[in-house]
């Protein structure tokens, strides 16, 4: 049996991949993708941000202060930022504007979870911490 996320052969029994997939995943994808994704969805009202890395890993990250700075967003996606489709309510999706031009690796995880055709890392950021409001 193959992992529904990374497509590698599953050793042992496997894990329930929901909500990251509709079948079984390997232990590595369970730890690096499924559990963090469940935590993100469970804490949607909080300020968790998902960094979808091209190594098939979902990392929960936070800004250094209350809001993300442009520099932090650029560091997360390794370059100029671009906002793309909203994949979760009240979240913005930040990607590298030049990911394809710079020949970054296709982000299989962003495609698998959200149907995003992204090259390089993707960041799923709650709107409320995306940038500092002018009146704050």
Regions from the language model: what does each represent?
Residues 3-6, 26-29:
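Short cysteine-rich clusters marking metal-coordination/redox-active sites
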Residues 5-14:
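Short Cys/His-rich Zn2+-coordinating modules
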Residues 1-2, 40:
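Intrinsically disordered, compositionally biased terminal peptides
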Residues 13-23:
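Short linker/helix segments within small regulatory modules
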Residues 13, 26, 36, 96-97:
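Helix N-cap / beta->alpha transition motif
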Residues 39, 43-136:
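Short beta-rich binding modules
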Residues 28-43:
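Short metal-binding segments enriched for Cys and/or His
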């Amino acid at each position: 049996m193959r992992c529904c996320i990374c497509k590698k052969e599953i050793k042992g029994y496997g894990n329930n991949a929901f909500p990251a997939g509709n079948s079984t995943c390997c232990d590595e994808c369970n730890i690096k993708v499924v559990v963090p994704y469940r935590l993100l969805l469970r804490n949607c009202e909080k300020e968790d941000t998902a960094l979808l890395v091209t190594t098939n890993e979902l990392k929960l990250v936070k800004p250094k202060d209350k809001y993300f700075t442009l520099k932090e967003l650029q560091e997360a996606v390794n370059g100029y930022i671009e906002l793309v489709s909203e994949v979760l309510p009240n979240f913005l999706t930040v990607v590298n504007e030049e990911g394809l031009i710079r020949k970054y690796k296709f982000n299989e995880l962003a495609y698998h979870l959200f149907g995003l055709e992204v090259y390089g890392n993707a960041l799923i950021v709650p709107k409320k911490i995306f940038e500092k409001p002018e009146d704050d």
